[in-house]
Amino acid sequence: MAAASEERMAEEGGGGHGDGGSCSAAGSAQRQPPAPPSQAPPPGSQAPAAPALAPDHLPQNNTLVALPIVAIENILSFMSYDEISQLRLVCKRMDLVCQRMLNQGFLKVERFHNLCQKQVKAQLPRRESERRNHSLARHADILAAVETRLSLLNMTFMKYVDSNLCCFIPGKVIDEIYRVLRYVNSTRAPQRAHEVLQELRDISSMAMEYFDEKIVPILKRKLPGSDVSGRLMGSPPVPGPSAALTTMQLFSKQNPSRQEVTKLQQQVRTNGAGVTVLRREISELRTKVQEQQKQLQDQDQKLLEQTQIIGEQNARLAELERKLREVMESAVGTSSGSGQSEESPRKRRKATEAIDSLRKSKRLRNRK
């Protein structure tokens, strides 16, 4: 009944942008039976002072529709979204309130699903092999399937909702999504995903098919810029697939859909996270480069100190070698002048061996 009434309201100009009082009066006038013919008063009786007001002309100060929108929304919040979608038939003012609540309900159920999915993902392990054996694996599967269903509903309805041509019509789908999400939150061992989501898939598929077949053709004629292509070419628009395609492309360029904006926002967030990671890596690399430069400076200082020590050792060795030679020459001179000592050859051998050992040690140190 709600779907047929939505089609009828779309044909009449239905986006719900009209005066509430006039519609309620017109609708009640159509539902009221014709008044009986007036009878003349009997002779001798007095005529009434003023005619009685019909029910349609009674003051509406005490009716539900006359309340502020906030009060009406607070009252309707105790009802299901399916009942709210059926209340759109009451009058145009009630239609406006119900449309607003249905649109807000779809956005709220999306946020609630994102919150549930974030909580489940935080408890799951990061490895895919461990996730399959985890106790929350079925919870994650059900939430992933609900996310797919929400994406399909978003692509089907929200383009026209953002253009203020209609509202999110199937309130029963919102109720079913809430039922599934509450079931996932309250159950430790839920059933398989296809068993839990069978009803949601059925009613959402029927709602999307009916919307595409019956309501979208009516709404396409009301899209802003539907006749712009014909006026730009100097001729009236020709109905057909090409004209509809041109209209949709023009509208999509002028007013980007909500899905495209969401994708751009996600891409910006991803790029921002990547830039943050790169900045962190660059700062770490700079710290490492500074540490390496400090180590190189320390090594250069140590090398300079070692070079100075080696130079000092070489100078000392040269001085000792010179002194040793002088001693040996004096010893050889004294031994050759006397020629009587038997130990002079032994002293010469020892002196030559000492000189050779000093020379070898000096060569080895120079090589080092």
Swiss-Prot record:
Query: Where does this protein have compositionally biased stretches of type Basic and acidic residues?
Result: 1-11
Q: What is its main location?
A: nucleus
Which Pfam families does the entry mention?
F-box
Keywords from UniProt, A to Z, are: Centromere, Chromosome, Kinetochore, Phosphoprotein, Ubl conjugation pathway
The ranges of region (Disordered) come to 1-56, 328-368
The UniProt entry, under InterPro entries, shows: F-box-like_dom_sf, F-box_dom, FBXO28
Q: Where is the composition biased (Pro residues)?
A: 33-45
Outline what the protein does. Probably recognizes and binds to some phosphorylated proteins and promotes their ubiquitination and degradation.
Q: What subunit structure does UniProt give?
A: Part of a SCF (SKP1-cullin-F-box) protein ligase complex.
- The name on file for this protein is F-box only protein 28
